[in-house]
Amino acid sequence: LVNSKIEKTITEGICFHVEVQDLDFDFINDLDWVIILGNVLDNAIEAAAETDTKFLFCGIIKDNDFLTILIKNSCKSQIINIENLYQSGHTTKGDGHGIGLFNARKILSQYPDILHNTNCNNNYFLQQLKLPETFTSKGKRVNISAV
């Protein structure tokens, strides 16, 4: 997934920094993982491509008792109404769009212990997911360090 996004950033002329530790993601359904990360990265690439800075960072790291997934990209807007982004049908792209982040949030609701934070500040958009070392995945307790 990340490799295909790297190719897209090269095509768009985006400076893409990636920091991914060798981690096992068996605790999240593969399709859920692809939908969440794919939508967030696609939106980040599209937003970064519209800026002069053209910057994107993707970090997936285990730090202390958390697995942290961080996506940060340049964007044109200083301030974005974050709640609107997650409404079904909300889009800046035209017809046939506006379900990606809505679906991502719906999937994330199945993992109640995943902390999801979205922020826009100083022309940078940030999405952060934090998974505690032990959390609930679709009704089952999972320990990341045991995965």
Indicate residue ranges for each PLM-predicted region.
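Short beta-strand/loop element within the Bergerat-fold HATPase_c
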Residues: 51, 55-65
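Conserved short strand/loop->alpha-helix "switch" segment adjacent to the catalytic nucleotide/phosphoryl-transfer site
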Residues: 16-37
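Conserved ATP-binding N-box helix of the HATPase_c
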Residues: 30-52, 110
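Short beta-to-alpha transition helix within the HATPase_c
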Residues: 1-12
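Glycine-rich nucleotide-binding loop
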Residues: 98, 120-128, 134-135
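Conserved glycine-/histidine-rich ATP-lid loop and adjacent helix of the Bergerat-fold HATPase_c
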Residues: 103-115
